[in-house]
Amino acid sequence: MKELSSAQIRQMWLDFWKSKGHCVEPSANLVPVNDPTLLWINSGVATLKKYFDGSVITENPRITNAQKSIRTNDIENVGKTARHHTMFEMLGNFSIGDYFRDEAIEWGFELLTSPEWFDFPKDKLYMTYYPDDKDSYNRWIACGVEPSHLVPIEDNFWEIGAGPSGPDTEIFFDRGEDFDPENIGLRLLAEDIENDRYIEIWNIVLSQFNADPAVPRSEYKELPNKNIDTGAGLERLAAVMQGAKTNFETDLFMPIIREVEKLSGKTYDPDGDNMSFKVIADHIRALSFAIGDGALPGNEGRGYVLRRLLRRAVMHGRRLGINETFLYKLVLTVGQIMESYYPEVLEKRDFIEKIVKREEETFARTIDAGSGHLDSLLAQLKAEGKDTLEGKDIFKLYDTYGFPVELTEELAEDAGYKIDHEGFKSAMKEQQDRARAAVVKGGSMGMQNETLAGIVEESRFEYDTYSLESSLSVIIADNERTEAVSEGQALLVFAQTPFYAEMGGQVADTGRIKNDKGDTVAEVVDVQKAPNGQPLHTVNVLASLSVGTNYTLEINKERRLAVEKNHTATHLLHAALHNVIGEHATQAGSLNEEEFLRFDFTHFEAVSNEELRHIEQEVNEQIWNALTITTTETDVETAKEMGAMALFGEKYGKVVRVVQIGNYSVELCGGTHLNNSSEIGLFKIVKEEGIGSGTRRIIAVTGRQAFEAYRNQEDALKEIAATVKAPQLKDAAAKVQALSDSLRDFQKENAELKEKAAAAAAGDVFKDVQEAKGVRIIASQVDVADAGALRTFADNWKQKDYSDVLVLVAAIGEKVNVLVASKTKDVHAGNMIKELAPIVAGRGGGKPDMAMAGGSDASKIAELLAAVAETV
């Protein structure tokens, strides 16, 4: 077996499959594009679903890739096991209706065992297969595999809901008896026992059925086109080929671990407690790649995952004695390890380091707050005479403050307290159940549509015309091809068309189809790409249509021009964002409609009003500069040399279209555009908002809509000016400010009067002191306007030694407000109010010295006051 670096393994994999006629699919962005079922790209096949379900027909049905992936369903196992990772690389080879079982197995065996390639010893390889899949068993035998090395497994059948499914065959490497101390042998495989002896290195999925949950597996229908989907973990291959005990001792992780050794002054011990080293090395890889791909730490979705990973890594750094920010210093090492195939980490290093460091600094402040929270919890336990920290409190520390359970346990035990592990597990399960319920159900490849996939007739979109005559090539009605149609809705394909099919954020054209008499025979309501790329017109049929007949196709010209204004303005906006807030502000989605444009982009904070003003000004400057817009067709490399921005998630063919707006903007784009930027007329941003962690959205209007937006603002300003009696519009702001200042003065004066009134009333309230259990208590109903007045009473009470405990109740509107304040350690205000609040049908809580509650039953106020003495 050859000893290869991870880069050599990856390259040899791709080279082998290229030699078998496969095209190399570049690794896609970790953030899925147009797939709401996935939080992250989590496998090599995840980006190829459109090929497998037939919605897009690939030029080459044989594909290979090395795909960066993230899975976060078992973060807690990372660092504990030899092979769990959050980010990993999946090597794959795929066949879309081309070769099948025989070639997949034969070529796979050749790659693994041939001296020209990986040169694995044959006697170290074991294969599992689905018991009913005798074809795979026989093919392995034909390759020279001993029957004793073939293990039937009932679970070797791949399916996720409806869609492509089939048996799979897995390949394992036997690391020998040293990794099997109990000498269990092949039972480890047959009974699926977790072990370190037989390492799964490759899985070959043989997709030959369309799974249907409504019928038994034996009744699944055969796919029109059978597919091959395989996955081999690079980290596992590297561990085997480099003789490493775990994945972490390979060249993918050890350089990071060495840097952590330098930062911590500790030494990594392969056989000792090395979990913190592993966690840090794994998590910084995921953070570096995910942030480089546009995901940013936040409080939900992908952002929450990244924040959790970063905080977990930071806490493990502290366990190694690293108390300052340090993770950002590891980004360079990650980039250097992966540079040969993933140069983007080094290219975006400054931005990634900035985000990681800023998040570390924020978390440092959070840790201080969390430590304070833990100290408060432990002090409360001491005051209450309890010896166990509750699971819900441990979970809050873990979930809100990012404290690993081990750290909480360590600190609590140092202080002499036990840990409620079961309560923590229960709280964790509740959160996981909520998360699962919120996930969009999906994952299936979807059923293949043979009718659409079977359209092979050529069709060409004509950019520079609004009307043309063309022959009708295909009619599909009720999901079947037909020669004619006279009513209902149908899908049409023409030899050529002026109708733009929805793509790249630009909506489809609408319009009409006319016969040779000039009569409208169909209304075009939508246009989408067919699997083989033809524009597929969805039409409402008004009169007879037949294949082979020529028709006149006319788009709605006014609508197209309005869409083009917004699309061209989107390109200007993208460039302006780069100039004003930074090149990290890359497109994360767009929509160019007739009435408005919507642009989503990566950014870690809200765009300030000043920045929005600069962006809007810059876009309008380019409009007024009347920049010529040109389009060029060329290859991708030439386009990039021209400075064209290629968007993540977009797949480009051999020939691409470059849209250039003067010297200001150059982008790869297949959409339609104006001839000159001046045709946009005017650009106005109407909204900027966050739509998820690390993603912002700008909604803007152009032309007539922009003018109307400005006019609406002017009308509103005129109305304000009239209300405040400003002689001119320019005086309105000063008038409003003067009114605001006057209002603030009145509010201040009113507050002072309230305080004086409260102080006067307090004198009467504080006279009535009772005693219970050696504690002096004041308990009274007061007449106040709001809950703030209760706090004012409490502030006055604190100034003098009126009593040890104060309980105030007020009926304000339909609600009852309760306040408890305590000056003595013997009475916990928060606990006391939890007992009192239910009496008035309320609830609340607070700190040991101050707590408040709200209720709804004012008839029970007297009962509450009577119960005060008993609750002390």
From Swiss-Prot:
Zn(2+) binds at residues 567, 571, 669, 673. It is found in: Cytoplasm. The gene is alaS. Keywords: Aminoacyl-tRNA synthetase, ATP-binding, Cytoplasm, Ligase, Metal-binding, Nucleotide-binding, Protein biosynthesis, RNA-binding, tRNA-binding, Zinc. GO terms for cellular component: cytosol. It comes from Streptococcus pyogenes serotype M5 (strain Manfredo). HAMAP family: Ala_tRNA_synth_B. Consists of three domains; the N-terminal catalytic domain, the editing domain and the C-terminal C-Ala domain. The editing domain removes incorrectly charged amino acids, while the C-Ala domain, along with tRNA(Ala), serves as a bridge to cooperatively bring together the editing and aminoacylation centers thus stimulating deacylation of misacylated tRNAs. This is Alanine--tRNA ligase. One of its GO terms (biological process) is alanyl-tRNA aminoacylation. InterPro entries: aa-tRNA-synth_II/BPL/LPL, Ala-tRNA-lgiase_IIc, Ala-tRNA-ligase_IIc_anticod-bd, Ala-tRNA-synth_IIc_core, Ala-tRNA-synth_IIc_N, Ala-tRNA_ligase, Ala_tRNA_ligase_euk/bac, DHHA1_dom. Its EC number is 6.1.1.7. GO terms for molecular function: alanine-tRNA ligase activity; aminoacyl-tRNA deacylase activity; ATP binding; catalytic activity, acting on a protein; transferase activity; tRNA binding; zinc ion binding. Belongs to the class-II aminoacyl-tRNA synthetase family. Its cofactor is Zn(2+). Gene3D superfamilies: 2.40.30.130, 3.10.310.40, 3.30.54.20, 6.10.250.550, Bira Bifunctional Protein, Domain 2, Threonyl-trna Synthetase, Chain A, domain 2. It catalyses: tRNA(Ala) + L-alanine + ATP = L-alanyl-tRNA(Ala) + AMP + diphosphate. Catalyzes the attachment of alanine to tRNA(Ala) in a two-step reaction: alanine is first activated by ATP to form Ala-AMP and then transferred to the acceptor end of tRNA(Ala). Also edits incorrectly charged Ser-tRNA(Ala) and Gly-tRNA(Ala) via its editing domain. SUPFAM superfamilies: Class II aaRS and biotin synthetases, Putative anticodon-binding domain of alanyl-tRNA synthetase (AlaRS), ThrRS/AlaRS common domain, Translation proteins. Binds 1 zinc ion per subunit.
